[in-house]
């Protein structure tokens, strides 16, 4: 009888622990140290089901996320929630500087190494921003969005940290850092005839 009672208690405890693990409000957790569901923000976004009609919450744990993040048009309602805006940082070193012409002002050509137009650059053919939001109903809080090029160089070509092309995008308690054109809003919605 004692073994039966112990078995029932053990099964009940396991069921409670399992229920608590499932009670997280987040559909995904990103942690650069590997303690979450994903190590990069883009991996978590890629896993979001297409055509969401309600918020898909992604917790991003404190850390430095050196990557470009693109939320595609077919992934609306993505919510990126960081732990602390000073410790949850999505950053990358890129700019949209054109090919060198030999007539650069003051001979400044260092930007070309990190230009999205340079075939030798690690960011060649990237979209021209650290984060590009195309999915509507985007929400984010407690995250810093940083274009390292703009912060480190304090001069040069356009170096976007955020490019929001989404309808109904909200930003709460976030930081945006770069040198030129840090945050770009470019919304084009064409209504179809009814």
Please tell me what each predicted stretch does.
Residues 39-50, 66-74, 80, 184-185:
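Short, T/G/N/S-enriched strand-turn elements that build extracellular solenoid repeat scaffolds
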Residues 61, 72, 81-83, 134, ...:
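Feature marks extracellular polysaccharide-active and adherence modules
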Residues 1-23, 100-106, 110-114:
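Bacterial Sec-dependent N-terminal signal peptides
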Residues 30-37, 52, 57, 76-157:
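Right-handed parallel beta-helix/beta-spiral solenoid domain characteristic of secreted/periplasmic
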Residues 27, 68, 130, 159-161, ...:
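Structural detector of coil-to-beta-strand junctions
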Residues 186-194:
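Residue-level detector of conserved catalytic or cofactor/ligand-binding positions
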């Amino acid at each position: 009888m004692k073994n039966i009672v112990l078995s029932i208690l053990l099964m009940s405890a396991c069921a409670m622990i399992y229920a608590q693990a499932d009670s997280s409000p987040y559909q995904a957790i990103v942690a650069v140290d590997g303690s979450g569901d994903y190590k990069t923000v883009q991996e978590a976004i890629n896993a979001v089901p297409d055509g969401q009609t309600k918020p898909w919450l992604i917790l991003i744990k404190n850390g430095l996320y050196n990557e470009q993040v693109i939320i595609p048009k077919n992934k609306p309602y993505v919510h990126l929630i960081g732990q602390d805006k000073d410790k949850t940082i999505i950053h990358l070193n890129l700019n949209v500087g054109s090919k060198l012409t030999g007539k650069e002002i003051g001979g400044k050509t260092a930007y070309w190494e990190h230009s999205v137009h340079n075939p030798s650059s690690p960011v060649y053919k990237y979209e021209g921003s650290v984060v590009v939001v195309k999915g509507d109903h985007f929400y984010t809080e407690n995250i810093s969005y940083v274009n390292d090029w703009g912060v480190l160089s304090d001069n040069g070509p356009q170096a976007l940290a955020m490019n929001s092309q989404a309808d109904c995008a909200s930003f709460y308690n976030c930081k945006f850092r770069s040198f030129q054109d840090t945050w770009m809003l470019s919304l084009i919605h064409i209504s179809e005839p009814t």
